[in-house]
Amino acid sequence: KLVGRDEQSDIALLQIEDAENLTDIEIGKSSDLRVGDFVVAIGNPFGLGQTVTSGIVSALSRANLGIEELENFIQTDAAINSGNSGGALVTLDGKLIGINTAILGPNGGNIGIGFAIPSDMMRNLVQQLIEFGEVRRGVLGVRGNDLNSDIADALDISVSEGAFVAEVVPDSAADKAGIQSGDVIVA
């Protein structure tokens, strides 16, 4: 039975009723991972059936990939292919530390750059699916960029770090709070 799903994070929560002989998996803390740790990816690539591949954690907190709105991925070189999305990324001692979600490669093929949603983030997503049947996200309602010295000079402002507000979405939380286009948020 589908409890809830979140297309944005590529996560679904299922409830299995009247099942016997199932073994649960211990959920590890992805915050304990280090670059270079060995991991195993489990999935169903191309519909071939259960498949296991191995690799290492290549990077942590990968973002700005354009895969999802909120990005904080574990990057691995374990082979993740089409059909592996939703599969487990586990440590060598069998602890779940990520949910395989995407690859970066030509034509959807594996070149050793795969991504998984960290278990620490997954816990929050799953809890929201249990409570609400969906993931609820707060939206500030601004579009902008990091402020740098070039933008600060062009705007003739004294601060050179912060968030430059380029646009405020009408009737958003930011609009209601009085934030305006051209503002710089520094703290």
Predicted feature locations:
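Conserved PDZ fold ligand-binding element
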Residues: 174-187
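Serine-dependent protease modules
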Residues: 1-177
